[in-house]
Amino acid sequence: MTTTKTNLLDFDRKGLRAFFSEELGEKAFRADQIMKWMYHFGCDDFDQMNNINKKLREKLKQKCEIRAPYVSEAQHSVDGTIKWAMKVGDQDVETVYIPDGDRATLCVSSQVGCALACTFCSTAQQGFNRNLKVSEIVGQIWRAAREIGLEKETGRRPITNVVMMGMGEPLLNMKNLMPSLDIMLDDLGFGLSKRRVTVSTSGVVSGLEQMIGKVDVALAISLHAPTDKLRSEIMPINDRWNIEAFLACVREYIASSNANRGRVTVEYVLLDHINDDMDHARQLAELLKDTPAKINLIPFNPYPGSPYKKPSNSRIDRFMKTLMEYDFTVTVRRTRGDDIDAACGQLVGDVIDRTKRTQVKQQGEAIPVKLFNLDVLQQGKAE
């Protein structure tokens, strides 16, 4: 859908106030009122905003819109997990809702596809098209809240936690990630606690450096290997920023953060007979000895055509117990939504691939382990 109207979901509070002042000739408090309507009440109809005068409502209808991605398909798991295909332009990204008692976590995408080509991730096999806009990132939360039921309707928050662990690498979309995080944390936005918003990164050091001292949220890092040699084999980004550089930046961010309570969450996908033996566990413990961390082990979630397998329960248990001998807090992630391909590493969406990765795969050739031009992404030229 092509439109010349300005989508107000693309602005954080600072940007919305500037837009109201400079483009609409209105006072800042009007922007605050609109923001509250959008995020507290899930309102996308200016006529329903009854504390806004009619003249301004008419101006807003002429020049602006409130447009979030819409749900093109929904799949429901037996465990209560819901996976939505969210329409962004002519493509889809996937968003996952994971209820757990009084908590409800939303796994949000940051890109259409992913540029990083991690060999164990289904999203990576789809290739990459573009970064999501602010309205397409926060719009996933906005739409999910509408689908589940707004707090004013149900008496409980529809979303209590947000994890930037969907499709894409969040720190390759800094231009749109930062204002999106501001909206998630803002009392006039979604009003989430900084400890309940998690950004996960595969190791984009330049992006993490930009976050230091500017935004304080929970940090999770996708490590997945204890040595540079193995990590480079399964995660090509390691050739750009190796483990040492990555962990040094992580320690700097954690030192500046209150949200993380002094330690980072290390995500480690367990691939059968690839990175899951006791030597790997001991190497991982040695690697992390100077980085305060809790370790989240993720048994591999298979997807069609995957070259990897999930380890046996005994191998998972041995790996976990070896790490615990070094006094690490270790958890094994409980798989949710795997019956609808909504588990970690299984999200695919509908991607018009700019990397030709899918074309190569269809021709029966090995997918080249090559990064999309990261500089293009970091400069915000892949919108």
From Swiss-Prot:
Family, per the entry?
A: Belongs to the radical SAM superfamily. RlmN family.
Q: What does this protein do?
A: Specifically methylates position 2 of adenine 2503 in 23S rRNA and position 2 of adenine 37 in tRNAs. m2A2503 modification seems to play a crucial role in the proofreading step occurring at the peptidyl transferase center and thus would serve to optimize ribosomal fidelity.
Ranges for domain Radical SAM core come to 100-339
- What Pfam families is this protein classified in? Radical_SAM, RlmN_N
Q: Which cofactors must be present for this protein to function?
A: [4Fe-4S] cluster
User: What would be the name of the gene that encodes this protein?
Assistant: rlmN
- The membrane-spanning stretches of this chain are none
UniProt cofactor note: Binds 1 [4Fe-4S] cluster. The cluster is coordinated with 3 cysteines and an exchangeable S-adenosyl-L-methionine.
| Annotated protein name in UniProt | Dual-specificity RNA methyltransferase RlmN
On the tree of life, the source organism's domain of life is Bacteria
Other facts: Reaction proceeds by a ping-pong mechanism involving intermediate methylation of a conserved cysteine residue.
The terms under GO molecular function for this entry are:
4 iron, 4 sulfur cluster binding; metal ion binding; rRNA (adenine(2503)-C2-)-methyltransferase activity; rRNA binding; tRNA (adenine(37)-C2)-methyltransferase activity; tRNA binding
